[in-house]
Amino acid sequence: MRIISYRAVREFKQKHPLASVALDRWYETVAEAEWASFLDVRLFDNSVDYVGDNRYVFNITRNFRLVAMVFFAPQLVYIRFIGTHTEYDRTDVTTV
């Protein structure tokens, strides 16, 4: 998959160093993936949630969430939000 918005990952890691290793692992694994469907995403991470309009919520360690739009045909993952669980709870992830 090609991931768009690495800048968001880099900036979040600077603010939240505890998430750094997990975000790097997520990024590297997704970059190597070739997802064709939600089932493939679920095989990667069985806790991922589909929230509509191509948006998926990934748990990054215990306290961090990443919302990305996944487009299977062109093999694109567009990061829309990275935040703490508290920030995630205050965000309408269906519109980010």
What are these regions, as identified by a protein language model?
Residues M1-F64, F71-Y78, I82-V96:
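Basic, Lys/Arg-enriched alpha-helical interface segments
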